[in-house]
Amino acid sequence: EQDEEKTENKFEKAPQEVQILPVKEPENFVKPKVKMHPFIPNPYDQELLLVIGSIRSGKSTLIANFLHQKALWGDVFGDNVTIISNTIKNCATSRFNLERWGDNCYELYDDSVIHNLVKSQEEKKKTGHDEGFCLLLDDICGSISANSNSKKGRAVVDFSTRFRHYTTRGNPVAIILSNQKFNDISTIMRVNATGVLISSAVKNKKELMSLESEYADCVGGSENWNTMIKRNQENPYSWLYLRMSRSPCEVYLNFKERLF
């Protein structure tokens, strides 16, 4: 009986409100060197970005702008950009990527590229030379299975779930995956995406239905979603940016106007 009384007293003294407090940043936390525009993806927030659009929709142009234009990301990654692209040596739009990071460009996907990136980042963290990184996967979903149980492209799928741990907190880090068809992207990568960029060139009904099924509920339902898609389709080379890392989701048109 005495033990029961002690237990009851213990609960009587418990606080009325329980708060989940944020964990303090580690001592080696790096303060961001560049302040990003609030309407664009922020690599200092650890981004996994999906870029969806058909051929000649401006995917490569958009990515080149993010990687090179000072008003966007500029050169925040320095030499630490790895590119896997079937067309890197034949695409005029991507030539600046090839010139800047030619030693880290690969025409064919192989798990070893990801394994080597992981090893490199682990070593940089140990020696204090870590400055963050960017991994660009350009139209290579034929090398990565959309089936979460498949071993095809498994290294990069697994990497996409924990990539943020391979750099010191506060450094810029991003994975960019561009593809022509949304459903060809690994389910795991779709679920973990922090941002989705949809081209106005996406007109195929099945493709639009796939995107609506995935994201309409995040923006208040199908009516809102279709209104935003129509706004995006008013002009060529337009982009709808869904910031999935926020709750509720934020939606921007051409990184200029907030729609939701």
Model-identified regions with their sequence ranges:
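A structural signal for isolated positions on well-ordered beta-strands in alpha/beta enzyme cores
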Residues: 82, 174-176, 240
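Pre-Walker A adenine-sensing motif
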Residues: 22-43
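Conserved GTP-binding G-domain of TRAFAC-class P-loop NTPases and closely related GTPase folds
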Residues: 187-260
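Charged, amphipathic alpha-helical linker segments immediately N-terminal to NTP-binding catalytic cores
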Residues: 1-27
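Short, flexible beta-strand-to-coil junctions
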Residues: 2-4, 87-88, 242-248
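Conserved catalytic segments around the Walker B and adjacent sensor/switch elements
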Residues: 74-84
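Conserved P-loop NTPase motor cores
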Residues: 37, 47-69, 73, 86-90, ...
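Short, surface-exposed beta-edge/turn micro-motifs
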Residues: 79-80, 132, 236-239
